[in-house]
């Protein structure tokens, strides 16, 4: 039985759930200002059915890819923009490819990209004041753009050295027996460890505790941003403590590991600047460049070890997961293709020709691997995990015009969110013949017959890190991904190492019954066009790696004095790359039902107690000021709505509201535990 003093909390929770989950999330977010604008554009995914708007927004969680494809074929190819519904947020206006150049030519004063990213990531709430400062003054991204890209030749040897040690630890070097691995999990560890060799140094990057807590932190921050976006702005400060509690321990461990090293590095750098005779030699890594950039700003706050740690964590958050997913897809696409044998033979021939034996590979040598480059670029085209790209917000108070959409030109008012259908562009038959087929050498021209001794194919298009109007994985234009050159170098290094030292054979049958019935939940919630998505990365619409297992043997000929044994049978199995696994579906259904039941319970109790007369024994009545008690005892008590408002804002309500909102996140914890349980069951 519910206690009397819980009345205000129950009423407050009913309002919170009703407003947040019904009015804000389910209803179409069309302001009065933009209602006429949205009515003048075609919509995708809308059907002639009851509650069409709400059902369309719910449907985008699982069908965003189909909606974008439908809009591309029906409208984009005829130079017409279309509206893509969104759940919990305003809809997207998807521009046709014909407007891409004009779209990218607009100045930042007209189309802002920072506001969109801040809204999607919710840095202020998910990463606190330090994270917000790091996003506002992005020294870490400036360092990557200006110094890491330029100094790649200097760090290439360290990358290869760490990559070799990582493969030894996670894939093994057994030349006799094959080893079973989880491809996605091990690729994430290898990428994280190798990248952090350049980010922060060898000591920290080899700490298993740091790698594990960094993975959990990155995973939880992404999910927290998705959840916080579901709530109205005025409610986000209230729900943030409950959402961020899941990864506070992970953040604390990462800080505990990094802060002493960073503090020591800062002191050594300052002493080196003061004493030219100091024998300490500054390492060549991102941390050192960050410290030097902070010193150039003449701001002592920038040298705070906690802030520098947050910058490194943010750099990991935005780079590691996408790179890990991309290289995992590349391996799966390559070894799972119908022509895998011929592709791998060509890649092995190129690696044998271009890469020396028993030496650390340089950047110049990797730049010659045009087939490796093409194989990864093709995988990123076929298995992209973003349905829409280049998000922008119209910031010009007078709006912007697009002449390329026809006559009359398209006028977009301020506040509208724009994007382009990247996934559909990557699969456009007009740009890529046979676009659904993985062709590892699509971007390479093989030497023609009679052309002489041309043993190395010439690249057909630009390198992996180069963006074009038809290749938007890294974005395009002046705001393209600043770390794409480093990511491309790392992925080429990984794939070349695998091709050089391991053979992969695809098994035709699942490993066991458990593998066929269970699917591994992904290590992060994909962002996207809805509440469970970010910039077009939907929870179920994007290509998903589910069970990717490898069996391998190490080719010891490169490092050991034994004969080469190159047989790494690898099994790559995915029941359905484009559908959610059954465990995740079941957990999501249970979570939605529980939330609906709690909302109905709170609203029902609130309505009942709203009409229940107050009396002197009621705890809520005793909290009423004396001057108001007479009014409540008068004949003809106040209307029910007035009682409702009073009970909502009675004293000491704030902490009770937080307590009741916590119930909702306990349900989310159950949903999250189901995802982890489905992963642990299989492992």
From Swiss-Prot:
Transmembrane segments: 8-28, 588-608
A molecular function GO annotation: oxidoreductase activity, acting on paired donors, with incorporation or reduction of molecular oxygen
Residues that hold heme according to the record: 481
InterPro entries registered for this protein in UniProt: Cyt_P450, Cyt_P450_CS, Cyt_P450_E_grp-IV, Cyt_P450_sf
EC number: 1.-.-.-
Major subcellular site: membrane
Gene Ontology biological process terms from the UniProt entry: secondary metabolic process
Pathway: Antifungal biosynthesis
Cellular component, GO annotation: membrane
Domain of life: Eukaryota
Industrial and biotechnological uses noted in the record: Due to their effectiveness as antifungal agents, echinocandin derivatives can be used for the treatment of human invasive candidiasis.
Membrane topology note: Multi-pass membrane protein
Entry-linked Pfam families: p450 (PF00067)
Keywords noted in UniProt: Glycoprotein, Heme, Iron, Membrane, Metal-binding, Monooxygenase, Oxidoreductase, Transmembrane, Transmembrane helix
Residues of this chain annotated as glycosylated in UniProt: 29, 581
Annotated compartments: Membrane
Cofactor annotation: heme
Family classification: Belongs to the cytochrome P450 family.
Function: Cytochrome P450 monooxygenase; part of the gene cluster that mediates the de novo generation of L-homotyrosine from acetyl-CoA and 4-hydroxyphenyl-pyruvate. L-homotyrosine is a building block of echinocandin B, a fungal lipidated cyclic hexapeptide that acts as an antifungal agent. This is followed by isomerization of 2-(4-hydroxy-benzyl)-malate to 3-(4-hydroxybenzyl)-malate by htyD.
Name under which the protein is recorded: Cytochrome P450 monooxygenase htyF
Originating species: Aspergillus rugulosus
